[in-house]
UniProtKB/Swiss-Prot annotation:
SUPFAM superfamilies: Complement control module/SCR domain (SSF57535), SRCR-like (SSF56487). This is Scavenger receptor cysteine-rich domain superfamily protein. Glycans are attached at N87, N190, N194, N229, N422, N601, N612, N765, N808, N834, N936, N985, N1031. Residues 40-140, 143-245, 248-348, 351-450, 453-553, 555-654, 657-757, 759-866, 868-968 form the SRCR domain. Residues 969-1028 form the Sushi domain. GO terms for cellular component: cytoplasmic vesicle membrane. Keywords: Cytoplasmic vesicle, Disulfide bond, Glycoprotein, Immunity, Innate immunity, Membrane, Phagocytosis, Repeat, Signal, Sushi, Transmembrane, Transmembrane helix. GO terms for biological process: innate immune response; phagocytosis. CDD domains: CCP. It comes from the Eukaryota. From the mid-gastrula stage, expressed only in mesenchyme cells that are migrating toward the body wall. At the brachiolaria stage, expressed in presumptive coelomocytes of the coelomic pouch. Also expressed in adult coelomocytes (at protein level).
């Protein structure tokens, strides 16, 4: 090793040693000179201004006993160290136990001494103490913040040589401010500010050109200019200021105002035990964080912390400024409280947006000293608005017009707000003192935030699958554990709407966005869905058909009589997140009928008068015809017309009806409203006549089927009706005969359900198609008439929606039907579905009416829906056969399953033919729904339903219970072909594929040059052959003729030519090898030898061309993929 290397290693060792020595040193406040007897230092504190008191005596540091330890003693220690004064005393080894000698005991300072050794005491090293009694002190540091009532921010003042002064802001930045904040006991700085705090200082400017690295223990240890020697341009208008972060935070929640409570102590964050945790404790935490009242004092899902537990048994009365001022167990005395008992809170943000079109845009109002006030718009920009949106609930700032101005309808309380954009709250930004404003024009600052939740796929804006915004991308929510409490939060987040239903199973179509939220568990009181407990973002075990959805409502009845048999009450509506009333002027039975139909699928018993509510009057003068489906479709005065001299609008509805748990709005469990509550209907005697009345009441729909046995899930309320016996002509379900309200002998597993429809399929002759999944599509009009759909623009996406709505299956193809008569009714035209809608009526469509005469081409729309599938197979063409019956998939018993049945199944599935059939899958699967116990086909049928069959699978037994088929999707490989190949060369080919056939050199094709895979998975022609060319004509320029007789001379000449060519090639090779060997030997000075000419095989291998090629004599036909064939 060179001396330079040794030198480098030595330097590395020295640097490493120095780095090790400088790490982990306690924060110690002590003189920089060599200590002498009576010097003091503070050890073990989080800053130089606090710690265990240690005194130097007889060459060693020792501690002070806390017997008689008081503020006068602490004042002398702090002044001796250069601090302005003492803040508090600490006993009982609060900063840890020392290890040296106990130097002093029974101190009794008067306050006039300059050094601790001058105070009366028991005597040096005289004591009756242990290190558990070591005294400590907290000094008022050498820095303070002035000019602001907020202890976290202000003008920086520094203590030097007995006086306080300011610091010039030259070179002042966030690193300098962070050092000051840590020196004051705060975690770090939010910003370094030069905003004026309070009246201008009159103190001397002590420092300028401060330049901290960021890790110093105090600002005085940073690089800076000479004390009291500052630049001439440093005036008090340039006094440096800071805004510090709080020594308390919320961690582990889903927003800045919720989570596990953590506090900073001795430079370390730690949690608080929830033993004795109360609402008053949460109030103090929220006040300390600058928020308003807590939403929920306990039970917040916050996860476990990882640091120490600083405090336990906290007991606040709600008036304390900080949590540590409340009575508690003492720092670090948490007992056996683990992190499973960490306390948490959810605080209400001290900001709100008022006067906008939604709850997330409007005038910014902040809460301070018990009242709300607005902000002056001067200097207000996107960074300020960004902080407001974050504080409101982690909303991103809307793109475009982020910062509109609004009328200052409440007093302006804040001016000159300057945010960096990183703050959590507006109150943490630099600003003028509260109430000190210079703002004119009557305007206030505003913000427009971007919504983080949307509904997609619904027929109106207040229903659909839920998607949420996370880190700039939208994603869906899995429906695991999804319930009405989750829906309440989503509807509130969308605009304080009322939740009607929580939906599952991608009810409004599959969402293209990936699932990013799962296992949501809201209490129902949260402000945002993100605030609810949920699995880790992006973690889920769901598929695309499990998207969660909601149905919200912007209108409701404030029921004034819960004992009433009928739904009745004051009508309330929501606008911009605020619920209000409708003026009763001109409110009549037509208006009431529309409302009752909209809310309860019923009619109005009467209009009614109730005592007025407390919300604003939002609408008035409704003039409905009675045929509208939504109260807002009626004419009325503009929003915000508050003139009303009448009572509030109110109604009494005749009962109520709704469907729950269905895949579409037209199917589900039947629920009725009676005696102030919703309940179910028992399926005893439930039939299609009962279903017909339900579907008619819901909107003149046609009943497709009556469902029993809680087909749409079990209800949870009372069972209100049993033994229903409708004749089919009633208008309302309560008009039918039944056992009496609430009288039943049923359980919820007997809840009745229905499937209604506004679609049907008909045959070409107009008859209704009841047992097939193909036919002309007809739509039910609002007047109750069935009509066709013009087929001009009908495509596969439209057909997909129809098949999903009617049968919960996909579309195999579209169909077109000619008009059955010139007078045939057409109800719809130019449908433009995207394929994800759950109802055809949700698709965009032309508003212009169509008739048989105006429908282009005279064709109507039809569909062919898929009613067969293969499941549980390991490949696409193989599996157990399942058929769709009554919207349910079920299998076929394999007892009579054979080649004929397999051929029909494959034909129906769209395959060419069946390769084979078998009974049961391996491994066997659990037996599910079985539709057919036998199936007997001739093989000529187009569908399995056309075969002779028996419904039900009760007689099918054993592990091989289900029919399985292997279908052919195309033609097999047509080879092998000897001495030839196919292009393309594959193991199988799709129908209508054409392949080329080629022969090797010396062979000629006998047959067609192409083959095509035709219907039935057969090739269009037999596979051709390649035959050897037996003779060639020489010199004639003609094509070799297979089988032609050449003369003897021609044959002899051919053989002689081949032999002579071979001899010439060998001679050339020998000469080349000779010359190569000779040159090598000459280069070495050795004579050429025979062995140098005749080298081993390797040198022949190095030749660029082969001597002779026999490939044409040995090539065979190529097989699929490998290109190899057989040798002769």
């Amino acid at each position: 090793m060179t001396s330079l290397r040794r030198g480098n290693i030595c330097w590395v060792a020295v640097c490493a040693a120095l780095l090790t020595l400088t790490r982990g040193i306690d924060v110690i406040a002590k003189p920089s000179r060599t200590p002498s007897n009576g010097d003091v230092q503070l050890v073990g504190g989080a800053s130089p201004a606090e710690g265990r008191v240690e005194v130097f005596y007889n060459g060693a540091w020792g501690t002070v006993c806390d017997d008689g330890w008081e503020m006068q003693d602490a004042q002398i220690v702090c002044k001796q160290l250069g601090f302005a004064s003492a803040n508090s005393t600490r006993c009982c080894a609060s900063f840890g136990q020392g290890t040296g000698v106990i130097i002093l005991d029974d101190l009794a300072c008067t306050g006039d001494e300059t050094r601790i050794g001058d105070c009366p005491h028991r005597g040096w090293e005289q004591h009756n103490c242990a290190h558990t009694e070591d005294a400590g002190v907290v000094c008022n540091g050498k820095v303070r913040l002035a000019g602001s009532p907020n202890p976290l921010q202000g003008r920086l003042e520094i203590f030097h040589e007995g006086e306080w002064g300011t610091v010039c802001d030259s070179d002042w930045d966030l690193k300098d401010a962070s050092v000051v904040c840590r020196q004051l006991g705060y975690p770090s700085a939010n910003s370094s500010s030069n905003v004026s705090f309070g009246p201008a200082s009159t103190a001397q400017i002590l420092l300028d050109r401060v330049s901290c690295m960021g890790d110093e223990h105090g600002v005085e240890y940073c690089e800076h200019g000479d004390w009291k020697n500052v630049s001439a341009d440093c005036t008090h208008s340039r006094d440096a200021g800071v805004i510090c972060t709080r020594p308390i935070r919320l961690v582990g929640g889903n927003g800045p105002m919720q989570g596990r409570v953590e506090i900073l102590h001795n430079g370390e964050w730690g949690s608080v035990c929830d033993k004795g945790w109360s609402f008053q404790n949460a109030v103090v935490v929220c006040n300390q964080l600058g928020a308003t009242q807590p939403r929920r004092p306990q039970g917040v899902p916050v996860g476990g912390g990882v640091g120490p537990t600083h405090m336990s048994f906290v007991n606040c009365d709600g008036t304390e400024a900080t949590l540590e001022q409340c009575s508690n167990s003492g720092w670090g005395n948490a007992g056996e409280c683990g992190h499973s008992n960490d306390a948490g809170v959810i605080c209400t943000p001290a900001v709100r947006l008022v006067g906008g079109n939604t709850h997330i845009e409007g005038r910014v109002e902040v809460f301070n000293n018990g009242q709300w006030g607005s902000i002056c718009p001067e200097s207000w920009d996107a960074k300020d608005a960004e902080v407001a949106c974050r504080q409101l609930g982690n909303y991103p700032l809307a793109e475009g017009d982020c910062c509109p101005q609004f009328p200052a309808d409440v007093g302006v309380v804040l001016d000159n707000v300057v945010c960096t954009g990183n703050e959590s709250r507006i109150q943490d930004c630099a600003h003028q003192d509260w109430g000190v404003v210079d703002c004119s024009g009557g305007q206030a600052a505003g913000a427009k935030c971007q919504a983080t939740v949307q509904l997609v796929g619904g027929s109106h804006p207040l229903e659909g699958n839920v998607i949420v915004l996370r880190n700039g991308r939208w994603g869906s929510i899995c429906d695991d554990n999804w319930d009405i409490n989750d829906a309440r939060v989503v509807c509130r987040q969308l605009g304080n709407y009322e939740a009607v239903a929580a939906t599952c199973c991608a009810k409004y179509g599959q969402v293209p966005q990936e699932i990013i939220l799962d296992d949501v568990a809201c209490q129902g009181e949260e402000g945002r869905i993100e605030d609810c407990y949920h699995a880790t973002w992006g973690s889920h075990n769901c598929g695309g058909s499990e998207s969660a959805g909601v149905v919200c409502r912007e209108i409701r009845l404030a029921l004034d009589d819960s004992s009433s048999n009928l739904p009745k009450g004051r009508v309330e509506i929501v606008y911009n997140g605020v619920w209000g009333r409708i003026c009763g002027t001109d409110w009549d039975l037509n208006d009431a009928n529309v409302l009752c139909r909209q809310l309860y699928n019923s009619t109005a018993e009467s209009v009614h008068s109730f005592k007025n509510g407390s919300g604003p009057i939002l609408l008035s003068n409704f003039k409905c015809t009675g045929s509208e489906s939504n109260i807002f479709d009626c004419t009325h005065n503009p929003w915000g017309d508050y003139t009303c001299d009448d009572a509030d609008a109110a109604v009494v509805c005749r009962g109520g009806l709704r469907l729950a748990g269905g895949r579409t709005p037209l199917e589900g469990r039947v629920e009725v409203f009676h005696d102030g509550q919703w309940g179910t209907v028992c399926d005893d005697g439930w039939d299609l006549l009962d279903a017909k009345v339900v579907c008619t009441q819901l909107g003149n729909y046609e009943a497709l089927s009556a469902k029993c046995c809680a087909n749409f899930g079990q209800g949870t309320g009372p069972i209100l009706i049993d033994g229903l016996a409708c004749n089919g002509n009633e208008d309302l379900i309560e008009d039918c005969r039944h056992e009496g309200w609430g009288s039943h002998n049923c359980q919820h597993y007997e809840d009745a359900g229905v499937v209604c429809t506004d679609l049907r399929l008909t045959h070409e002759n107009g008859s209704v198609s009841t047992n097939t999944l193909t036919g002309r599509v007809e739509v039910l009009s609002s007047s109750g008439e069935w009509g066709a759909i013009c087929g001009k623009y009908w495509d596969k996406k439209d057909a997909e929606v129809v098949c999903q709505q009617l049968f919960n299956t996909s579309a195999m193809d579209t169909r077109k039907f000619y008009l059955s008569s010139p007078d045939q009714l057409i109800n719809m035209g130019e449908v433009q579905c995207n394929g994800s809608e759950s109802l055809l009526l949700q698709c965009p469509r032309a508003s212009k009416p169509f008739t048989a005469q105006t429908c282009p081409g005279g064709e109507t729309a039809g569909v062919l829906c898929k009613d067969i599938r293969l499941v549980s197979g390991n490949q696409r063409e193989f599996g157990a056969v399942e058929l769709l019956v009554d919207s349910q998939w079920g299998s076929i018993c394999a007892d009579n399953w054979g080649p004929n049945e397999g051929a029909v199944a494959c034909k129906q599935l769209g395959y060419c033919a069946a390769k084979g059939t078998q009974k049961g899958l391996q491994p066997a699967r659990t037996q599910g729904k079985m539709h057919f116990s036998s199936m007997n086909c001739t093989g000529s049928e187009s569908r399995l339903r056309d075969c002779v069959h028996t419904y039900g699978g009760y007689t099918c037994n054993g592990l091989v219970f289900e029919a399985v088929v292997q279908c052919k999707a195309g033609c097999d490989w047509p080879g092998p072909i000897r001495h030839g190949s196919f292009s393309p060369n594959r193991s199988s080919y799709d129908p209508l594929t054409t392949i080329d056939v080629k022969c090797d050199a010396g062979y000629e094709l006998m047959g067609s040059k192409t083959l095509q895979c035709v219907t039935g998975c057969d090739w269009s022609r037999p596979t051709p052959e390649c035959q050897r060319i037996s003779n060639c004509s020489i010199g004639g320029g003609g094509k070799p003729s297979v089988g032609a007789q050449a003369g003897p001379a021609g044959g002899v000449m051919l053989i002689i030519g081949i032999i002579l060519g071979a001899v010439v090639m060998m001679l050339i090779a020998c000469v080349a090898l000779y010359l190569k060997g000779r040159n090598k030997n000459i280069g070495r000075g050795n004579p050429a030898t025979t062995s140098a000419i005749w080298k081993p095989k390797k040198e022949f291998d190095e030749l660029k061309e082969p001597v002779l090629s026999f490939s044409a004599m040995t090539a065979g036909g190529a097989g699929p993929e490998d290109g190899m064939g057989e040798d002769i």
